[in-house]
């Protein structure tokens, strides 16, 4: 009985060892940092001598699979791999080092003339930030047996400004035109023939696959957001009591936001590609108009509590909405006109907005020009809104103090509380919108850092869901819901102009106290 038990335990141990040997991943070594060293000389201590490099036994393993770019495993013949990239910098090739690539296909046995014509040097950015020019074969380990990144690849010609790239010592690859960092499984290098006028040259060129992010999440959020915007606009148009000056400005803001996001969605679905530039400029116009309407709201709130002479205030109230329209739409037209002009006459790519560039029907947000034409005005308007809301808050405190020292304070206190609620809701709107766009600006500055770019992805989702947030804040609140029910029953059709009243009351209060 004891002998049988020992035999069973031995069998289990043997099976475990066999399985472990079959899938002998090298400890703390990425598969894409290994090479096949089966043909290398094996020494008595278990280490291998590979291309003049001593690979210790602890950095070797027997594999009967290979890992594909999607992390799945493919069964292959058993072979020995070594984690040589921990010992010496590696360069990831698509095919063996003496092959040349043409239209994504590797061709073997380069001729002596082609080998003589080949430029064998690569610029490698070291860990300390310096750039070293290295011979691909003599100073680096060539990894050529890794699976191809994808079926269809495109190459980069670093003679072109838009095709610049950076190859790092640890094997990562940074593509400049879309500021994307690629791992070894997502790109490879190979010799390629380039035309140089009437002559040709052979150089090492990177071949990689575009990282196409899933648009499902963005699509769902943006469609939901657009639906909520339509519902919000409909409620404010249906309920007469909401159509005071605040409400009219808010409706204009929502219309601009809806149109801006609609053009973003059309760009996301590539629907606007047939009228790309006009779609890009129209989308830009409505987004900037939305920002100007948000500044109108903050300015109007401040003016509501500021107070002025009775006649002047009455005159301004009757014509203020026209003035606000002239300002918001006019400034958006001016900025859009400047952007259109710059897009057509500015030759320097760093100063050109490049609307419709790289297949996106929007202003090009990967370059410094985006700060000049898009994020710069955005920062200025956010700063203006912050200033207005702070000044309004100070004025509310001042009016509250005045009311405490004035007769009939209960009636005026009710009006103040009503406008304080209006201020609070619009302040909440600005905080949500200002925060989301501020994070968007942070996302713009962090594009070169993939880690921070992933963090700021939260800002993108917050931005895309603005319509949902506004619907919750402005329509699903109890007071709006009550007004909607009254309007459905045909009650209370009078427009609420309390913002004018509080301004006039505050002015009278101030004059009496003086």
Swiss-Prot record:
Record-linked Pfam families: 7tm_2 (PF00002), Methuselah_N (PF06652)
Protein name listed in UniProt: G-protein coupled receptor Mth
Predominant place of localization: membrane
Topology in membrane: Multi-pass membrane protein
Membrane-spanning intervals of the chain: 219-239, 249-269, 279-299, 321-341, 371-391, 425-445, 455-475
Subunit structure: Homodimer.
Ranges in the topological domain labelled Extracellular: 25-218, 270-278, 342-370, 446-454
Intervals, Cytoplasmic compartment: 240-248, 300-320, 392-424, 476-514
Keyword Signal: yes
Disulfide topology: 29-83, 85-90, 94-188, 95-106, 150-209
Superkingdom of origin organism: Eukaryota
CDD domains according to UniProt: 7tmB3_Methuselah-like, Mth_Ecto
Further comment: Agonists of mth share minimal sequence homology, suggesting a remarkable promiscuity of mth for activation.
Gene3D superfamilies recorded: 2.30.160.11, Methuselah ectodomain, domain 2, Rhodopsin 7-helix transmembrane proteins
Keyword Methyltransferase: no
GO CC, any one term: plasma membrane
């Amino acid at each position: 009985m004891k002998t049988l038990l020992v035999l069973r335990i031995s069998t289990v141990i043997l099976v475990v060892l066999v399985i472990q040997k079959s899938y002998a991943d090298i400890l703390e070594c990425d598969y894409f940092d290994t090479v096949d060293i089966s043909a290398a000389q094996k020494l008595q201590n278990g280490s291998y001598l590979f291309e003049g490099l001593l690979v210790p036994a602890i950095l070797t393993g027997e594999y009967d699979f290979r890992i594909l770019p999607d992390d799945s495993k493919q069964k292959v013949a058993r072979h020995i791999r070594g984690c040589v990239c921990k010992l010496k910098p590696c360069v990831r090739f698509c095919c063996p080092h003496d092959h040349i690539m043409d239209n994504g296909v590797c061709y073997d046995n380069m001729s002596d003339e082609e080998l003589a014509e080949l430029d064998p040097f690569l610029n490698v950015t070291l860990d300390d930030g310096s750039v070293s020019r290295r011979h691909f074969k003599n100073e680096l380990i060539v990894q050529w047996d890794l699976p191809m990144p994808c079926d269809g690849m495109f190459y980069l010609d670093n003679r072109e400004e838009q095709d610049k790239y950076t190859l790092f010592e640890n094997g990562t690859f940074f593509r400049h035109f879309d500021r994307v960092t690629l791992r070894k499984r997502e790109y490879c290098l190979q010799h390629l023939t380039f035309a140089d006028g009437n002559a040709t040259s052979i150089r090492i060129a990177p071949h990689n696959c575009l990282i196409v992010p899933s648009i499902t999440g963005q699509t769902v959020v943006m469609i939901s957001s657009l639906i909520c915007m339509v519902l919000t606009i409909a409620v404010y148009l249906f309920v007469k009591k909401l159509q005071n000056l605040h409400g009219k400005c808010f409706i204009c803001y929502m219309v601009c936001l809806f149109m801006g996001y609609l053009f973003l969605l059309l760009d996301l679905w590539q629907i606007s590609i047939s009228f790309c530039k006009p779609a890009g400029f129209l989308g830009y116009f409505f987004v900037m108009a939305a920002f100007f309407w948000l500044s109108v709201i903050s300015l109007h709130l401040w003016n509501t509590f500021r107070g002025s002479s009775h006649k002047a205030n009455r005159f301004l109230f009757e014509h203020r909405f026209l003035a606000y329209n002239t300002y918001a739409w006019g400034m958006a037209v001016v900025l859009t006109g400047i952007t259109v002009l710059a897009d057509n006459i500015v030759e320097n790519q760093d100063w050109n907005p490049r609307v419709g560039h790289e297949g996106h029907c929007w202003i090009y947000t990967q370059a410094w020009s985006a700060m000049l034409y898009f994020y710069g005005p955005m920062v200025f308007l956010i700063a203006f809104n912050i200033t207005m809301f702070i000044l309004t808050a100070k004025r509310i405190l001042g009016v509250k103090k005045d009311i405490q020292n004035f007769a009939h304070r209960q009636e005026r206190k009710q009006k103040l509380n009503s406008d304080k609620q209006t201020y609070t809701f619009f302040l909440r709107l600005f905080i949500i919108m200002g925060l989301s766009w501020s994070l968007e600006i942070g996302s713009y500055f962090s594009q070169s850092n993939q880690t921070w770019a992933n963090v700021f992805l939260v800002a993108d989702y917050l931005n895309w869901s603005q319509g949902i947030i506004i619907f919750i804040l402005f329509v699903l609140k109890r007071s709006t819901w009550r007004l909607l029910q009254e309007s459905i029953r045909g009650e209370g059709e009078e427009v609420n102009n309390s913002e004018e009243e509080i301004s006039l009351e505050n002015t009278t209060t101030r004059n009496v106290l003086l």
